[in-house]
């Protein structure tokens, strides 16, 4: 990825001038309101072979360095007024006094059109020493897409059960393990069995889950 400053490349194809954005630093409460951000034209490509279902949009944002005394870092998120989020992949300060930020917005073509809640298991003991596990909200309202992978039918002691495996795509990078589960809008819960791209800032996080059944 080239970060060389090219005024023609950076400003000849700008899509918007001096719009308000918010810069967020994931994992912290830090945020900065910036009023003079400039965005170039969005470049859309397919993130992987998916028939167009998974796309990645790349763009260059220019942030006025005079607006705050910090500096953008890879992994920071630029949020537009319409709530569209852009993850910064790389940033450099140019001779014009603006931060040139190469950003990406990974999106499912149909949209991350569901909002799921992530719950965490809390283990406690009663006065008699018996252990019990209860589930508590950990992260709510996470934009996601739930994608079925496969279903397996099993006969267990004359009882037929169906085991459903799914993938859940989220834009947020969440530190998940087996102590977490995901609750869908219809109340269905999914046990987390694995995840990918949790350490990458340039890809959607993929969560492998199994539907919980009584």
Model feature map: region roles:
Residues 1-35, 109-132:
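Active-site-proximal polar cores
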Residues 22-111, 130-214:
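Short, conserved turn/kink motifs that form compact alpha/beta structural patches or helix kinks used as
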